[in-house]
Amino acid sequence: MRLSRYFLPILKENPKEAEIVSHRLMLRSGMIRQQSAGIYSWLPIGLKVLNKVCTIIREEQNRAGANEILMPTIQSADLWRESGRYDAYGKEMLRIQDRQKREMLFGPTNEEMVTDIFRSYVRSYKDLPLNLYHIQWKFRDEVRPRFGVMRSREFLMKDAYSFDLDYEGAKMAYYRMFVSYLRTFARVGLQAIPMRADTGPIGGDLSHEFIILAETGESQVYCDRAYLDLAVPGADTDFRNDAQLTDIVTRWTTPYAATDEMHDEADWAKVKPESQVSARGIEVGHIFHFGTKYSEPMGAKVQGPDGKEHLVSMGSYGIGPSRLVAAAIEASHDDAGIIWPKTIAPFGAGIVNMKPGDEGCDGVSEKLYEALTNAGVDPLLDDKDERPGAKFATMDLIGLPTQVIVGPRGVAAGEVEVKDRKTGERQSLGIKAAINMLTAQA
């Protein structure tokens, strides 16, 4: 993409309404625009990042055996009355009527609808286990939306729902999603720590929030430093191997980790002082087993191997891709702007033509652009006629992993300068060497 043809509305000043780093940088870098309280448009560069996050989520959900569907945003109130949640949910749910005066709602979540889909088609235990997921926009009428897309009223969610014959099957479904989430967050460039969460009236120990450590986090969290050294499960993880999954979950739940709500001072005291980490955290995912909470009132049953009907045991697993984008910025930025992990960066590299109109600079820039494009690097070529300082500021702000600087002096010497955004390291390379280095990373 050429910057001269790209819609990138950069803000030079810090927006007054932005309270946290991610909100400020997303507005300044032209990723989002606020349309009303807690509701945002995603602009081209922001949408590219959001789509890359969703791609990684899809790949890992599919790897774990989940099936993607797409449920509507508008739901019937009748389904929610059937589960008993319509009147109990509260003012966060946006309730509407169609022209026939039928009561509808803008879905804040999808347990009822996915249970209705399941009960309409699945009759036998032989069709289990089953995990259905979708990525869809949701709306919750927050009293005080704040922090940009971190706590907005409209947001994108990946919701997965598992259906199993019994608790043991549901536990393994939970373990599959647990491991899938570890891999997902690592691929997005985040070090997420699973922390035991409240299971409410259902009880048990199958509820975890995935937390990343960040100074601007809303929650106080406590964990053993051992988590920071645990190896994330690799791409060769066998999601059909129950023993392997159980071993991974055991390793990732044995050290102490808890949010403020679940913090136990007695257990915390057992952690060596030098291993204690007390910090702020941001929730980026939540997985939860809720048994027959929805299958019972909605009659979601299957015939078991004993010939009798059994209520299915269910779980839900949520990641907010839009929130995840903001979390990645909170975890990786500096005073100059965003520092994107390579996996979700909007472009693979930025080419800075220091002197558009100069035959040598234009020629080298075009050569780099063509080579990187053909190699799948997806470069952004800054071909705009602006002063060098503005070009560098824009590249640092939008956070592309690598910058290739093409200037008259370097071109005369047959070289370009390559800058690593994260480390700030610069090196002068021959044009062919620069192309080889960047295409090797594609």
From Swiss-Prot:
MF terms in GO: ATP binding; proline-tRNA ligase activity
Enzyme class: ligase
Keywords on record: Aminoacyl-tRNA synthetase, ATP-binding, Cytoplasm, Ligase, Nucleotide-binding, Protein biosynthesis
Annotated SUPFAM superfamilies: Class II aaRS ABD-related (SSF52954), Class II aaRS and biotin synthetases (SSF55681)
Annotated compartments: Cytoplasm
UniProt-listed Enzyme Commission number(s): 6.1.1.15
UniProt similarity note: Belongs to the class-II aminoacyl-tRNA synthetase family. ProS type 2 subfamily.
Purpose of the protein: Catalyzes the attachment of proline to tRNA(Pro) in a two-step reaction: proline is first activated by ATP to form Pro-AMP and then transferred to the acceptor end of tRNA(Pro).
Subunit structure: Homodimer.
Protein name (database record): Proline--tRNA ligase
Naturally occurring in which organism (per UniProt): Brucella abortus (strain 2308)
Gene designation per UniProt: proS
